[in-house]
Amino acid sequence: MTQIKYDFGSGRSDPATFPVAALQAAATQVIEEQAEALTQYPGDLGHAGMRAAMARREEDREGIRIDPNHLLLTNGSMQGVTLTAEALQENRGDTVLVEEYCYPGTLSAYRSLKYDMVGIPLNEGGMCPDAVERELYRLHKEKRLPKFIYTISTYQNPTGFVMPKTRRLQIIEMAKHYGVPIVEDNCYADVHYDGPLEPAFYALDNDPNQIYLCSLSKILAPGLRLGYI
């Protein structure tokens, strides 16, 4: 059997980069300082301190102030994928626009909910706006507009494509025209090294129909299951 040195199929982090000592120290500090709080339920949105930290994280990255009360902690990004799909679904068989090549876990979640998935062709800039517009127009005429558009716009899985700002703005305008929410899964944005990072969809427009998913799995550890909406 061939030995695989680097597995690009699963999005695993390198165990050697796991900050064991730092997390041990942080866990000890939390137990010492917040022992009583740890014995209580954190509320429906999740731990307030963690939500505030993630809000600061997004503000530092996107330059947009985020109200921590608009953040929901999730069990990794995939729970966010499932929760948003469940929340936006009205009936089995509802339509969703997805990228033609899409992360298998997302496809599996949507299949389990009986979504009718319409694939949008990709090129080096991600979802093709012409195809998005064409499908929105067609589905509008058929009176079955998609419940949302799902995209991994930064380091798309499996292609690795990054959608430029101009294209993001185009898709935002199309979605607003038809009243269709955008669900952006930004779980790979932290795997970025050189040059400016393209802005998230929500940072380009204050449309409340935009839903943003993010995760710490790719920069910390998938097993910790830390994500947020």
Map each language-model feature to its residues.
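N-terminal "arm"/small-domain region of PLP-dependent enzymes with the aminotransferase-like
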Residues: 1-45, 49, 56
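Short, flexible coil/turn micro-motifs enriched in small/turn-prone residues
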Residues: 4-6, 41, 155, 218, ...
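Active-site donor-binding loop signature of nucleotide-sugar glycosyltransferases
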Residues: 10, 122, 215
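Short glycine-rich anion-binding loops that position phosphate/pyrophosphate groups of nucleotides
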Residues: 11-14, 153-156, 218
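Short aromatic-enriched loop/helix-cap "lid" or pocket-rim segments at secondary-structure transitions
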Residues: 18-22, 161-162, 194-196, 223-225
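Conserved core segment of the aminotransferase class I/II
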Residues: 23, 206-229
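Conserved core of the PLP fold type I
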Residues: 32, 37-178, 183, 189-204, ...
